[in-house]
Amino acid sequence: VKVGRSAVAMEAAHSHTGALAGRYEVYRAAFKKAGVIELSGYEEFISACKAMSILKKTVPGRRVMIITDGGGMGVNIADACASLGLEVEPLPEKAKEQLSLLLPRFCSVANPMDLTGSATDELFAEALEKTLDTGGYDIAIVAALWGPPALTDELAHLISEKAELANKPVIICSPGGVYTRAKTALFRKYGLPVFPSPESAARAASIVCRGGRRA
């Protein structure tokens, strides 16, 4: 986290860091050239620590796939991703055709993908596998709201398996209370980072994508 980016902050930084203070543009260019991931503040720093310590990988692109069991949550995540420069691209025709054969008609076969309140562990897993395999996406955000009665503790294991098979990072977004926190502990058990809001999940995805790009 580079402080002293504005003129006022730069002046204040001189009294604390001395020689490390200077024109922000110079540091930014040096960071990019060296492959340093620049963070905008402590919220992003916390997201970076959580995502990178668990995933231990970055990606060179910025195309993100969003899969959820609640349409509104998918839209919120898409907005958060777009505001950070991530690309929420439409599903390619090949992936759409394959998923249309697998998923119930009432599911939204798009990006974001809404599996609705009828989602099952298997539907989440199949959707993730097909989109990462044929969609050309670099990273996925899976938002399980735990409303659908057919979701079980096996979901975390299945999502982890598909992420490992595709060799691509998957981030979990799962807002909620005590019940949800107990469920999301299962994702962490299987090596998947969990974030409590669309904004924090999108921040984590942005950091993973930024880490794989050079100037």
Language-model regions, residue ranges each:
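Peripheral docking tails and interdomain loops at the edges
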Residues: 2-68, 72-88, 157-215
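Short glycine-cluster motifs
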Residues: 11, 60-138, 143-145
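Glycine/threonine-rich flexible loop motifs
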Residues: 149-154
